[in-house]
Swiss-Prot record:
Superkingdom assignment: Bacteria
Key word Transmembrane present: yes
Family note: Belongs to the serine esterase family.
Pfam family, one: Hydrolase_4
Name of the protein this chain belongs to: Uncharacterized protein YfhR
InterPro entries in the cross-refs: AB_hydrolase_fold, Hydrolase_4
Topology term for the membrane: Single-pass membrane protein
Bilayer-crossing regions: 13-35
Organism of origin: Salmonella typhi
Record keywords, A-Z: Membrane, Transmembrane, Transmembrane helix
Localization per Swiss-Prot or TrEMBL: Membrane
Gene3D superfamilies, per database record: alpha/beta hydrolase (3.40.50.1820)
Single GO cellular component term: membrane
Main location: membrane
Amino acid sequence: MTLQHTRRIVKSLFILFIIVVCIYLLPRVAINAFYYPDNKVYGPTPAEAESITFTAKDGTHLHGWFIPTAFGRPENAVATVIHVHGNAGNMSAHWPLVSWLPERNVNLFMFDYRGFGESEGTPSQEGLLNDTKSAIDYVRHRADVNPERLVLLGQSLGGNNVLAAVGHCVGCANMRYADQAGIRAIVLDSTFSSYSSIANQMIPGSGYLLDDRYSADRNIASVSPIPVLILHGTADHVIPWQDSEKLYALAREPKQKIFIPDGDHIDAFSGRYANLYRDAMINFIQTALSAK
């Protein structure tokens, strides 16, 4: 074997090595572009909040708040809402959007995914899904919560995690079967339909690098018969409202959609609309609870 031939073989092996590394790393780089965690404190801890540390299934320590109903004992609340936030900030940034819920006689549980706020770890698709499941399990086992009256509120990316946590991936080779016990209603606010679709909107072709098993469009049909409410602003500058139209078409009954004229991203429960969409959510929850 000549020296020149040896060099060609080494060069070919090196190129092959680079290709393998890229195939392995690029999907991880692409999905990490979805997450913008920080530990900045955007406001004081709510006075009524119980600060919680709970453990994900893989041992990661996660931080949450339990804010009881403003009316009487928590176990007698209309429901307990588990809030699953989006891909940026932490729960202190999202608190103003849901601070009204305890005044409607519901308990509220908020938590931060791994790597967000005071929670340990590093974000990943599977990690955030496991964190969401662990949060639901934690609330189910609280002595002061009625485990048969749970509501999931997923905002933006949180909607994908909610649906993946209580649904299973339709069309996937290895389907996940999730525990839907006690989940009486699901509310999705400004949720994108799939990781690949939103990635392709940002960088054409990048969606092929992502794992869509955790995407809303793969899981929404399988959460039936849990009622689903979908809200989205028609002027959302982050996620097109058409994503929610697609999700509504895929969802099974019972389902409801509300499109907010000129509404922006996760805008439904902001102060812009007073109680209009807050009332709609509470009415939806009460209807879902009365169905059984």
